[in-house]
Amino acid sequence: MFRARHLLGIEPLAPPEITTLLDLAETYVDLNRRTVKHSDALAGMTQINMFFENSTRTQSSFELAGKRLGADVMNMAMQTSSVKKGETLIDTALTLNAMHPDLLVVRHPQSGAVDLLAQKVNCAVLNAGDGRHEHPTQALLDALTIRRAKGRLHRLTVAICGDIAHSRVARSNLILLGKMENRLRLVGPATLMPSGARDWGCEIHEDMREGLKGADVVMMLRLQKERMDGGFIPSEREYYHRWGLDAEKLALAAPDAIVMHPGPMNRGVEIDGTIADDINRSVIQDQVEMGVAVRMAAMDLLARNLRAERGAKAAEMMA
């Protein structure tokens, strides 16, 4: 069962809803590997992608997902939109709502902006990342990648390493993996740990070698310099020496540990290129593949709920 009206974050989702979405995504993995990659799940529906921040993987993934489901997909060019002329987010939302879209996919630099927008529209809204808050589809695709690689999504030791403080990916993964009863570790310099991290029910390790010991999953995060307003690290060279993932540090993890990265990667900063390209350990390209399938599943489920809601309202009006 999946009851969500929007997909704004992982926090509101119950474990059975997460499992339902991942199970449906599995069917879309199979569809995406066929010669004809098409479904009519969103036939007759309109999807609008609004990205107030630059994106390659997420935006193209959502666009491809919508088209493979049969939706009419429109990408708004935010750099040339009325937002640049001073229009508020709410006015933009109201304008789009008047066009009767069915799904809005939104990325915004301000935490909470997508939640605000969702309150102003009648369609389903998917959060493609808002500030430091959440990135729900990234956590879901990571979960699917882990489940396929490890055969389960519970009782695993997961080390999330790097710039935790500025990462919405880390936050969403912590919530999701915590709901599924995993052992979680945050690894990185104290300057890149969020305040209150010790209250999140996970281990904190400033020493990367300690943090990686016996880990089943090693998730690397890039330095988000665009969200930094001060000197958080001495230098990239020093950072790589202490917290960059190389063969010597990875050897401390479980022998069958997988290596993940949400992208974009900074090779030689948070991860060595040979590790990123190691087909026996790295599942980074699998994450990209799972991203399309997970976004297809999310939009499919939200569309079903939207149709049911609209059908109930229509029946009520006719009664």
Curated annotation (Swiss-Prot):
One of its GO terms (molecular function) is aspartate carbamoyltransferase activity. GO terms for cellular component: cytosol. PROSITE patterns: CARBAMOYLTRANSFERASE. Carbamoyl phosphate binds at residues 57-58, 107, 135, 138, 263-264. GO terms for biological process: 'de novo' pyrimidine nucleobase biosynthetic process; 'de novo' UMP biosynthetic process; amino acid metabolic process. Catalyzes the condensation of carbamoyl phosphate and aspartate to form carbamoyl aspartate and inorganic phosphate, the committed step in the de novo pyrimidine nucleotide biosynthesis pathway. This is Aspartate carbamoyltransferase catalytic subunit.
